[in-house]
Amino acid sequence: IIQATYVLNAQDSRNFWREVSSIPVSGERLTVPSSYRALNLDLNLLQQYLNTAKPEPSQTSNLTNGLMLEVPMPDGSFERFSIFQYNIMHPDLAAKFPQIKTYTGKGINDVTSTIKLDVTQFGFHAMIRSSKGDVYIDPYNQNTVNYYMSYERKNLVRQNSFECSLADETAMEIQNTVSNTVQRTNGTLLRTYRLALACTGEYAAFYGGTVSGAMAGMATTMNRVNGVYESELSIRMIMVANNNLIVYTNSSTDPFTNNNGSTMLSQNQTTCDNVIGSSNYDIGHVFSTGGGGVAYLGCVCSSSNKAKGVTGNSAPSGDGFD
């Protein structure tokens, strides 16, 4: 009986998707893979199905007894995953944004696969990592939540340049304060960090100019970041309970210089300390639409530098930003 239910659920989840020969949606595309599988999604049915997923177990290595979900792959096949709900936000913050749902899972067909997926007001997003390479599923563009692309990361055509740099004036100071016997993760213990994630008014404007829109964009990005950090460093970041207080929607009154990453380092440190409270977060960061990527080295949990990190891109969405 259990096996029959297992197969039925997996088969039903395939029916949320319908392959299409073309996508009848106009508008600018920020994600432009050279090759992709075009799909139509019944988002409402998928949401209803995902809402039945169980919470992630305390032992994150045991992800084999979750909701069975079949996911469309770029080559025309479907792969099965065992899915659980998990929180990328503190429960108090998640209660303020019930439309944002994040999920994690493990591959069934391919046991090397892991998946992170989310559903927000901007649709469905998924990132699959395996020994065969990375696969993404994203809306065709910002004008639709019903048409999607399933594509391999290696086929992604970069639309925007991105520069990442290091603010190194404190690197030597930090290096001198870190013990040579720091314990490194062995991959079996998942370490959680409290994240204070701010944004500029310009970033929020990209997501409709609302706190809920900006939070949705942040959730998609951080879900994918966690997908990488969990598998490679056994680290997870969760947004703090009052994170909404540092999501700014007015570029004229926010505390940030949107196009200057170096300047925003100290601005974000001050903002996170004053609004969130230094003792209430482990790492801080700010999203913008300019300023590139810049951060201090080894600053996590360092009280004077732990919020000095910036990520900015004119189109803060998709793999180029996430």
For every predicted segment, state its role.
Residues 124-129, 282-287, 308-313:
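Short, hydrophobic/proline-enriched secondary-structure or compact coil segments at domain edges
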Residues 46-53, 83, 117, 149-150, ...:
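Generic hydrophobic, helix-prone segments enriched in Leu/Val/Ile
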Residues 5-142, 263:
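N-terminal prosegments of processed precursors
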Residues 214, 310-322:
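Short pre-active-site segment immediately N-terminal to the catalytic Zn-binding motif
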Residues 1-3:
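Sec-dependent N-terminal signal peptides
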Residues 12-31, 144-304:
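Fold-level signature of zinc-dependent metallopeptidase catalytic domains
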